Amino acid sequence: MWNNHGGFDGGYGGSGMGGGGYMQSPGGFGSPAPTQGEKKSRSRSQQIVPCTVSQLLSATQNDEMFRIGEAELSQVTIVGIVRHAEKAPTNILYKVDDMTAAPMDVRQWVDTDEASCENMVVPPGSYVKVAGHLRSFQNKKSVVAFKIAPVDDMNEFVSHMLEVVHAHMTMNSQGAPSGGGSAVALNTPGRLGDSGGAFSGGNDNATNGLTPHQSQILNLIKSFKGNEGMAFEELKNRLHGMNVNTIRQAVDFLSNEGHIYSTVDDEHYKSTDGD
């Protein structure tokens, strides 16, 4: 599942993270299609399904089973930024935002008898990869995490979104009736900076060489309607969970690359797209 270094024992497709990963595990989505009997006997716990927060929030529940379309899921992974962290004696509650929907509650139980790394609180503003079980209590969904690992390389954010697309397309092709339409809607409208187009079609900023931070800031500036453009102070207010230096570096990069330009002064910016 997870190795001693905090990563997957066999990542998606077994590429660079060890062998026997998501695409190659027995009965996994990269294996030959199992028979109906095998499908029924296979435990959901053998599958770790890459998802977006939007998909998890829209998943349907029948008894203790969650589904996206016809696909069962129990163990899931999400990648996002920590917006809030609150530590209690027995657990840590995070709000993790992958910018496809409202931030999702992620609860990690801690060992009260040991001062292990699992008991350390990940600070807000950090990107993390969460692996855990989808749960619902009083009609509110959350993830109970068995592992939360920091994401240092933003390529992992983009890689996760590609894993999401591949996993749910594969589940769709296995679960959809022959000749039928799509059984699993990806439902990833994108909410980078509360504006659309984050992960859909050709407007995906991640494919244009931008990091998630840069994409979020660019979309905020695009969505601002004032004639003078968005002020840097307004950016800081909107991105209160993000480090000021990170915001400044992203703004400088976007300006140098021609995505935005300054207007009335060096602290107001508009998008060169003219949206």
UniProtKB/Swiss-Prot annotation:
Region described as Disordered: 23-47
Post-translational modification summary for this protein: Differentially phosphorylated throughout the cell cycle, becoming phosphorylated at the G1-S transition and dephosphorylated in late mitosis. Phosphorylation increases upon replication fork stalling.
Biological processes per GO annotation: base-excision repair; DNA replication; DNA replication checkpoint signaling; double-strand break repair via homologous recombination; mismatch repair; nucleotide-excision repair; protein localization to chromosome; regulation of DNA damage checkpoint
UniProt key word DNA-binding: yes
Organism per entry: Xenopus tropicalis (Western clawed frog)
GO molecular function: damaged DNA binding; single-stranded DNA binding
Pfam family of the protein (one): RPA_C
Superkingdom assignment: Eukaryota
Compartments, as annotated in UniProt: Nucleus; Nucleus, PML body
Keyword list, A-Z: DNA damage, DNA recombination, DNA repair, DNA replication, DNA-binding, Nucleus, Phosphoprotein
CDD domains for this protein: RPA2_DBD_D
UniProt DNA-binding region: 76-150
GO cellular component, one term: chromatin
Gene3D superfamilies, per the entry: Nucleic acid-binding proteins, Winged helix-like DNA-binding domain superfamily/Winged helix DNA-binding domain
The protein, known as: Replication protein A 32 kDa subunit
Free-text function comment from the UniProt entry: As part of the heterotrimeric replication protein A complex (RPA/RP-A), binds and stabilizes single-stranded DNA intermediates, that form during DNA replication or upon DNA stress. It prevents their reannealing and in parallel, recruits and activates different proteins and complexes involved in DNA metabolism. Thereby, it plays an essential role both in DNA replication and the cellular response to DNA damage.
Organism classification: Eukaryota, Metazoa, Chordata, Craniata, Vertebrata
Family note: Belongs to the replication factor A protein 2 family.
Subunit text: Component of the replication protein A complex (RPA/RP-A), a heterotrimeric complex composed of RPA1, RPA2 and RPA3.
Keyword Repeat: no
Underlying gene: rpa2
